[in-house]
Every structure is written in structure tokens, then in C-alpha cells.
């Protein structure tokens, strides 16, 4: 029984290390299988679906590619590192899996964030954080011999050292720190990546000895082939900072040999310009490049140097602030295994209006440079791409004098989308267009404005002149980051991350909500009741809306045609109705007519407004002269209109209002238009009836011909711009489908796993870097590797690979075929003496799996094996004495006897296992029978008790209409009179 238990224990250990989905070895008993089934099913039912849309390929390598994806749940950008495992060697495969292990351990603002990994057939997909600023290598090349400012170098140095400190505290040696592996965001936030060569050490005194890394950044100890530790990473950091200071590689040569010589001798390519940089910074870099590893500082010691210590808190706060917009929480556990749904879509931007009734597709903005947000102004358009770049151009009708609202540094009329180069390096999250100006918000919450400052919409008290031709930052919000911005024709309103509202610009009709009609040229804080949490701001041409978390709407400004929804209809006692009109309001007032709905989106136009509630229903109010309310007529409407008709039963997801027209998109991928169709406003030629000089339609009419999903939509004046997407195909990828779970991989790489030494030092061995692993993960347990190498040669394992009687599993057979050759001992006695006490604990597994294979191998291999192992043969004398080595004649027969004995033990164990399974089945059957009898007895007892109680009650109070026989028929047989 103990032998069988050890056998099963060892199989479980191997299966767990190799990611086996079975709970144990061999045939599972009914109990465990039954218990695993519901658990697996329950896990599958709870799996989260994550939806991704591919954007473009960032780069290709020999074994895969990196692709940019947009995750639709939070509209974030991620990178999928796709690795074709079939094209990798076993070492390269382990490196890929090792990167997952390392990244899963690390969580730091200056380290590339790992989100998930998936398996698509034989392709490993690693989901990582996207850095939109390229890498440090390209950043240095773009300098073109213009040295960095010391402040920028110190900023980079602090972030790099902070990341290295984090990985070293986790016991991880990076081993490939270089400028190509240091990534940047557009806000100059450093992200240290590429952990494929990283290694986990047991302690700060542990050493490694495998030759890995990039030659230009190798430390002297690596070049000399001696053991190295965390100080090797510090050397690489010194090389990177030296490169930042000189824009040249620290060590350079024409061939690797000369390069190693220069590294060992400390012959640098050039020296740092001491007139450009402080002595303290230069000395810090030189200390990292000390030839003696012991003299190099640790990462924590570098952070404690005065140059970094005096600004450490300030830079830490800056890193946290810059990282906040893109920071995404990790899953609570690594075992949740979500499902990835990858949907390929075409993404296009269309514009119409201004005399063009046919939608015009923009070729500049398309897949690969797709749009995430669009905005229309009276004279121009603006688009933010998925990579957070801003494009602007004039609208189609043109002819209007520009005031710099395009932000290109001039007043030229660019009729095609043009990238605003002055914002290069800034990640633009949102843009809003006014009449002749533009305001945008970055990921960091900073505000940039450009265009006309006639009404003070630049927010800088008119100090920049009447026109601003290039994006200008509003320093007012440096310490109070902005969440959202909205522009009217001549005013601006913003919502900060602290949920505060600020407004400035033209104050006519009280549109700023500041209790006056004064114009303000700098941002002014708006008083909002503290009980209300504002979640969105939206400006009309001469009014403003605030949307609260509870779905309430506050409005201020001009309420002409009741377009703010502020008018009240009151009923008297004797059917007398009074209609109270509010012409305008200078402070934010609750729109009571909208209080019956929980509003989620509001879209003001020039004369009317549309809103979407939490149920996807569309509401309209305001002027209905051209049928823009979509109610099927052109009559004046006093209140709020809940749209039915063509939109009845549909969920509206996007809506926008222009000058006397409305465009809406539904969740079933339809686009509707209604209202004034003049000058191409509706992208169609309505035939309902002429209305004055314009062509109008009062019912929502479908446009665009085919089904399109609309991520964003904007109307202003006569113009409309929208993003349309069509699904090409969709694919579902289930995470960890082949057992490549993080827990599995890390279990094998942990100190207790395969290959780890026990003396406090963990060393890279040649076997670790070259021994193949057919499982796709790391090797198995240390006991299994030792035992197999000591008892079976690859030749013998191959000889039995096709045998019908072999019980060796396929994965184990492949392991044996690729195992290192170790000679076979000559006789049973040395064989048994070769095992230590710890190895004897797992001997049954070796006997069951290994020796059975060895016993059936061709015997002609045995003399060669024995002749090659004089160390284990007591009959062979020392080679140094010159005595010829002759194998004993009885060795083969002795070994055969030992093998036969072990075969008998195998059969005995298997028979015992089968017997135990049969006994378990019998016991289970008996228990079921006993349970049934027990339940039957309990039911009879309860029934008898109830009958006896009823009989006693009958005797005490007999019913006159029932005789004793009929009463007894309601009970059990025990109450019948005996015949």
C-alpha cells in the first residue's frame, strides 16, 4: 500500500510540473473524476470574456510578431506578443514561458505590466502593457547629436534604477538590460521590459553562470565566464546611462572578441562631457561601471545617492501621476483564466453636410490609424486616433477665415486630416471644437488650447494675443488634472478628476453658470451642490448641461424653444393648465421634466436637444419646426418626447444634434437621421414633403445602406462626422488551454523544482539551457530527472518506444529519448549503493516507469554501457594502473535477474491497485444500499408516528361520518383490524 501511494504521489508531482490536466496518474478512480467535472464546469461558466480588436502589427521577429490591440471593456491599448512555439527550440520555449513567470511576479509603475496570456493552438499570446513612445534606443537616435539635458537624464536614471530595485528585491536577475528593452510612453514614463532571459536567484548572494545577454552591455564577469549576480545588472544600467550622456555606446568594437577585451580592460569609447553634466552624475555612472562587482552600488544605494534622494519623493509622485491614466488592475487571482474574443473590424471615418449629401470616406483615417473619438466644429473637424494622436482639418464648405483652430502653426486651410505635430509626444485622450478654436485633454489630464481668443476661450487672460496658432498648455490645471472638456460656440466647460467644474469664455445668457452674464478669460470654479456628483459636462452653442451620477440633469444658458428642458407645465384643481417658461438662467438649474428618467447621455443642438436614458430610450425636446424631434410631425412640442415609431424597441447608443437635424445609432447597427435635410445634412434626399425651401423628414429614417457599428458621432452646424465599424470575423481564445498556466511554469522554476541546488546558491547549468523539454514547460521534479538519468539510456528507451507491452506514457518516452546519456552500472549491488536515502523515497516510481523500459531494450547495447562505466564496476581496476578493463561474464545475467524481480514488483503493484479499486467500488455500492435502507426506515418511522397521532385524535374526537374501516384506510396496515 505504501509503494502504491509513493507511486501515485510522484506521478502527481510530475503531472503538476508538466501542466497535466489529469488529477493523478493512470486511471482515475470514479470519485476524483466526478468531483473534478463539476468544478471544471463551474469554472468555465464563471470565465470572463475579454474583447479585443486588432489595430496594427507593431513589429515582426523570427518567431512571431507584436500586435497592437484595443481592449473594448476599458478602451485601452495593449500589446499581444505572439510566439509560435513550434518554431522555437526547447530553450527558447522556456525563455518565452519564463517571461510570463517573471512578469507575473512584478508590479511596478516602471515595469511593463503583464495582464494575461492565452494559447491559440501552438501560438503563445502574452498580453502586455503598450508603450506609445517607442524605446530608449530610438529616443537616443532622434537626438541627432544634441545632448540630453541633465534634468532629463536624472529623470530617466531614477525610473530605470527604481525598476531594477523592484526586480532585484523580488530576487530576479534581468540579464538583458539595454536601451532596446527600455520602453517609453509619450509622457516620458520609463517601462523596463523583455524578461525572457531573466532568472530568479535564491538570495542576494546567489550567483549565476550562464552566458546570456547583449554583448554591448555585458559585464566583465560575464565576458570572463565567471559567476555573476545582481551587480551585473548594475553594470548594464551604467552602460545605458552612459549612452544617454554621450549618445554613443559605452564600449564599441568591430568584433565580439575585441569588444570583450575592451569591456574587461575598461576601455570606453569616449568620456562624458564634464562641462555639460555635473560631477555627481558622472561619478554615479562611473561607480556602476566599476570593474570589480563588489565595488558597484546596489540599486537601493543608487536611489539613496544625494542626486536622486533630494528629488525622490517629487519624482515618485510624478511617476504615479503619469501612470494613473493607463494603470489597469490585475485579476484577483491568476487562476481565473478569462476567454479572449478577438474581433477583426474595418474602421472608417465618414463626413457629410455643407452641400455634400453623399458620405465622404477619409482615406487618411482608416484601419491601422483608426479613430477613437471625433468632433465637429462650425468650421473644422478634429479626430483622436486609437494611438492618441490629434488630426485636424477644415470642413468641406471652406471659404471661412481661419484663426489657428487647426493648431498647425499657421492659418492655412488644410482640407485633409493633418497630424498636429506640435502635440507630438502627448497622448491626447479627448478633443472638443468650438466655433473658431479647439481644446484637447491629454492622458495626464493637462489641457491644451489653440485658435481664436476673442472671447477668452484660451483661458490665459488674453496674454497670448487674439489668436493662438499652436497648442498652448493651460498651467491653471497643472495641479488639478482635467477629466473631460466640452466647448460651445464661444465658451469652455471642463470637469476635473476631483469632480469640480470650471468654465470660462463668453458669459452671455449665463451659459457659464456663474450667476452672471460676464465674460471670463480664465477658468472659474462653478458652485455645484456638494450632494451632487458630476460625471459629465456638455456644452451647446449658448448653453451648458451637467450630468450627475444619479442621472439628473442641470442646465444653464439660453432656454429658447425649451431646448434646456427648464420650462414647467402645471395643472390646477379645475383643469386649468399653466405653462411656465424660463427664457434663460445664469446658474445651473435642475431640469425637472427630465427627472423622471435616468439620463446617461445628452446632446445639445442649436435649437433642440436629445438625450439617452439608462434603458437606451431616446428623448427629444426643443424646437420641432423641421421635424428634428423625430415625433412624426412638425407641431410645437412643449415637453419631453419619448421616441417610438422606427426607434420603438431599439436601444440607442449614440446621438448628436446639429442645426435642425438629428443623427442616432442603435445597438443593432442601424443609423437613423431626421429633421432638416437641406445642404446634405441627412446624407440622403428625403421625399416626404418640402418644408419651405428645405427638405425635411419628421420620422427617423435609416441611412448608410448597410449595418455599421458607430463608436462615436458628432454633429455641428450643417456637418456630421462619425466612425463606422464592420465586423469581419471573430475568434474565441481560451486562456491556458494547454496547461501553460502561470502556476505551472513557476512551480517548475522555483527553488524546490527541477535542477535547483540545496546550498543557498542557484547556478545555471549547461543541462538547464540545452536539455529539451517536450512538455512545452520546464522540466519535472529533481527526483524524476535524477532517477531516469541514472537508470535508462536514450538508446534503450528508443528501443522500447514501439513495444506493445510498455506502460511508459508518451510524454515520458520523449523525455527519455532526449535525456543525457549516463552509463549503466554493472551489477545489482553497486546499483543499489548508488542511491541516496532521499532517492530511495521515490524508487518505486523509477522501478515502475524506468526499469521496465530498460529490461526490454536490446541486450547488445549492454556490454558497451558496462564498459563505459568503470567507476561503478567493482571488478574493474583503476585505469591509471594500466590494467585492461574486462567486463565480468555474469553482469548481464545479474542485471536480468534484478530486472525480472522489479517486473514482478510492478505487476504486484498494479494488481494491488486494481484490487483496491474493486474493493472501493464494492464499498461504494454497499454504502448506497445502506443509505437507501436508512432513508426507507426513516420514512416508515415518520409515517407510523403520524398515523398513531391521528388514531389517538380520532379516538378522542371520532368523526360521525366515517366508520372505523374507512378511517384506517388512510393510515398504515398496522391500524387495520386483524381478520
Curated annotation (Swiss-Prot):
Relate the outcome reported for changing residue 167 to T.
In NC; increased autophosphorylation at T-210
One GO cellular-component annotation of the UniProt record comes to: cytosol
Give the EC class as a word.
transferase
Q: Which residues carry this modification: Phosphotyrosine?
A: 52
Q: Which SMART domains match?
A: S_TKc
The GO molecular function terms of this record are: ATP binding; metal ion binding; protein kinase activator activity; protein kinase binding; protein serine kinase activity; protein serine/threonine kinase activity
Give the UniProt tissue specificity note.
Most abundant in heart, liver, kidney and testis. Also expressed in smooth muscle cells and fibroblasts.
Acidic residues bias: where?
760-771
**UniProt entry tagged with the keyword Magnesium:** yes
- Which residues fall in a compositionally biased region of kind Basic and acidic residues? 950-962
Q: What is the effect of changing residue 870 to S?
A: In a lung neuroendocrine carcinoma sample; somatic mutation
Q: Which domain of life is it from?
A: Eukaryota
**Cofactor(s) listed:** Mg(2+)
Q: Which residues form a coiled coil?
A: 892-939
Q: Which residues bind ATP?
A: 58-66, 81
Q: Which reaction does it catalyse?
A: L-seryl-[protein] + ATP = O-phospho-L-seryl-[protein] + ADP + H(+); L-threonyl-[protein] + ATP = O-phospho-L-threonyl-[protein] + ADP + H(+)
Tell me which UniProt keywords the record has, alphabetically. Acetylation, ATP-binding, Cell cycle, Cell division, Coiled coil, Cytoplasm, Disease variant, Kinase, Magnesium, Metal-binding, Mitosis, Nucleotide-binding, Nucleus, Phosphoprotein, Repeat, Serine/threonine-protein kinase, Transferase
How is this protein organized at the quaternary level?
Homodimer; homodimerization is required to activate NEK7. Binds to Ran GTPase. Has a greater affinity for Ran-GDP over Ran-GTP. Interacts with SSRP1 and SUPT16H, the 2 subunits of the FACT complex. Interacts with DYNLL1; phosphorylation at Ser-944 strongly reduces DYNLL1 binding.
* PANTHER family associated with the record: PROTEIN CBG16200 (PTHR44535), SERINE_THREONINE-PROTEIN KINASE NEK9 (PTHR44535:SF1)
Give the domain note. Answer: Dimerizes through its coiled-coil domain.
Role: Pleiotropic regulator of mitotic progression, participating in the control of spindle dynamics and chromosome separation. Phosphorylates different histones, myelin basic protein, beta-casein, and BICD2. Phosphorylates histone H3 on serine and threonine residues and beta-casein on serine residues. Important for G1/S transition and S phase progression.
Q: What is this protein called?
A: Serine/threonine-protein kinase Nek9
**What species is this protein from?**
Homo sapiens (Human)
Instruction: Name the gene for this chain.
Output: NEK9
